[in-house]
């Protein structure tokens, strides 16, 4: 069993899993997290107010992180292929619902299903790839996570082109349909390597849940992982507002997050190379420090040149953090329930996705500006990095 497993790791099939992962993350991110590109067309087609449109995105995000994470936990009990196929069918169902519904409730249902299917796909991809690698694990994860950045870069122009010619339903039929077909195609290939690294059949039941809830280091790692994303969701919520407050023209500020995503594509590959050489936990922690420091600098940005420099640093931080967490937690807490473990961390991340924008808004209102909020959120990011680093320390070093 071990010889068979060793022969599969770092093999041609391993890299096929990576290639499909890049494609799936590109499409999933390009559908779910480019909402701002098509939100106006969606609102016009279904008569949604600004509040209702923002609620649609909130529901999608909640489903992506919470329902997708929980689906990942449950997926540890069954073979992966039907789970992946179910996610593909879910995306197809979401596209179908959007074609026929005319109500706000129908739109919420469609995007809730889309978020759940997309989140499930995400958890499967990032938990499966590390199981197929040994020597090149960091490089493989870095390449896989380029899909996220490529989706944010490549899909917006496609959305714009399609919306100008077909409207929201037609655009969703094309992009959503391509996403569904790609996930279904991956279902024919995706499986866990024979025997897993642990040689055990994954079991997620009451005992596993109890042991997980009583594992202080896992809980510290989950808390840290949630906090270390504080900077990212603060930027998602109000980067344009932060930059324009400092005097950056709005048209320039509107392109800022795309720059972060673009830089992160190269940084994801580079971080994998660094991880294979200096250590995966050290590389991720360095990315957290860079992101937190950049957040603290952001309130003092008053010109475009330093703005671009800080955006490059954010992209470097994102490129180090995003691809490396799953191999860290799988390696530390065991690959036998890899999908479930990653699902737990994904659910934890949802808390920050919701709370960081709210905390930023409340602190900004209380302080009258962005300086204090961003400094405090930078500290929270650093605290998350420390907790995650300590919580994922090898058992011998614990």
Positions of predicted regions on the chain:
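Helix-loop-helix hairpin linking two adjacent transmembrane segments in secondary transporters
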Residues: 144-192
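Extracytoplasmic gate region of multi-pass secondary transporters
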Residues: 35-40, 215-269
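Helix-to-loop junctions at the C-terminal end of transmembrane segments
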Residues: 67-79, 267-279
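C-terminal ends and interior cores of transmembrane alpha-helices
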Residues: 89-102, 290-302
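Interfacial helix-cap and linker-helix signal at transmembrane-aqueous boundaries
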Residues: 42-43, 74-75, 154-166, 243-244, ...
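C-terminal transmembrane helical hairpin of 12-TM major facilitator-type secondary transporters
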Residues: 260-264, 277-328
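Intracellular juxtamembrane helix-capping segments at the cytosolic ends
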Residues: 42, 120-133, 320-333
């Amino acid at each position: 069993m071990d010889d068979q497993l060793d022969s599969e790791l770092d093999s041609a099939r391993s890299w096929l899993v990576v290639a499909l992962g890049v494609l799936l993350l590109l499409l999933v991110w390009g559908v779910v997290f480019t909402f701002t590109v098509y939100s106006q067309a969606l609102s016009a087609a279904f008569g949604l107010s600004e509040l209702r449109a923002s609620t649609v995105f909130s529901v999608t995000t909640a489903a992506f992180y919470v329902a997708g994470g929980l689906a990942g936990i449950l997926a540890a009990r069954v073979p992966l292929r039907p789970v992946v196929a179910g996610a593909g069918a879910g995306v197809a169902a979401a596209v179908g619902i959007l074609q026929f519904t005319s109500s706000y409730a129908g739109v919420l249902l469609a995007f809730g299903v889309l978020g759940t299917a997309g989140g499930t796909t995400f958890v499967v991809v990032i938990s499966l790839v590390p199981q197929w690698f040994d020597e090149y694990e960091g490089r493989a994860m870095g390449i896989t996570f380029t899909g996220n950045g490529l989706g944010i870069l490549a899909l917006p122009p496609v959305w714009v082109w399609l919306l100008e010619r077909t409207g929201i339903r037609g655009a969703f039929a094309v992009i959503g349909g391509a996403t569904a077909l790609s996930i279904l195609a991956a279902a024919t290939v995706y499986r866990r390597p024979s025997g897993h690294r642990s040689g055990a059949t994954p079991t997620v039941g009451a005992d596993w849940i109890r042991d997980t809830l009583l594992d202080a280091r896992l809980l510290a790692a989950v808390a840290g992982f949630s906090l270390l994303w504080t900077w990212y969701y603060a930027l998602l919520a109000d980067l344009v507002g932060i930059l324009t407050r400092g005097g950056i023209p709005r048209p320039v500020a509107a392109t800022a997050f795309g720059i972060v995503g673009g830089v992160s594509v190269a940084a994801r590959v580079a971080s994998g190379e660094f991880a294979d050489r200096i250590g995966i936990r050290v590389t991720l922690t360095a990315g957290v420090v860079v992101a937190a420091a950049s957040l603290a600098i952001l309130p003092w940005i008053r010109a475009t040149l330093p703005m671009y420099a800080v955006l490059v640093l954010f992209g470097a931080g994102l490129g180090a953090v995003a691809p490396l967490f799953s191999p860290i937690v799988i390696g530390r807490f065991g690959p036998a329930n890899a999908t479930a473990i990653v699902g737990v961390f994904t659910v934890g991340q949802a808390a920050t996705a919701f709370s960081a924008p709210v905390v930023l808004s409340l602190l900004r209102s209380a302080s009258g500006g962005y300086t204090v909020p961003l400094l405090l959120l930078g500290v929270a990011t650093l605290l998350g990095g420390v907790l995650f680093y300590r919580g994922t320390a090898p058992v011998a070093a614990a």
